[in-house]
């Protein structure tokens, strides 16, 4: 008998913060405001399960909303790389 793999939506897991791909126009504005090049942001691999789930491609910028016990909600950005 063939075994079925169990699937679940990783984005619904309680430990995974909200991720979203930033539109190109907004990404350009964010990069300009931060005064960095996209590749200077922390990296997120395109093969990361969450990157795959949200459809992030190399060159995209991903916004992540994290909950912090000391700072409340924190927004961080990641640059998607292909390796």
From Swiss-Prot:
Catalytic reaction annotation: RNA(n) + a ribonucleoside 5'-triphosphate = RNA(n+1) + diphosphate
GO terms of molecular function: DNA binding; DNA-directed RNA polymerase activity
InterPro entries: Arch_Rpo5/euc_Rpb5, RNA_pol_subH/Rpb5_C, RNA_pol_subH/Rpb5_CS, RPB5-like_sf
Main location: cytoplasm
Keyword Nucleotidyltransferase: yes
E.C. code: 2.7.7.6
EC main group: transferase
Keyword Nucleotidyltransferase found: yes
Annotated compartments: Cytoplasm
GO biological process, one term: tRNA transcription by RNA polymerase III
Subunit and partners: Part of the RNA polymerase complex.
Role: DNA-dependent RNA polymerase (RNAP) catalyzes the transcription of DNA into RNA using the four ribonucleoside triphosphates as substrates.
Official protein name in the record: DNA-directed RNA polymerase subunit Rpo5
Upper lineage: Archaea, Thermoproteota, Thermoprotei, Desulfurococcales, Pyrodictiaceae
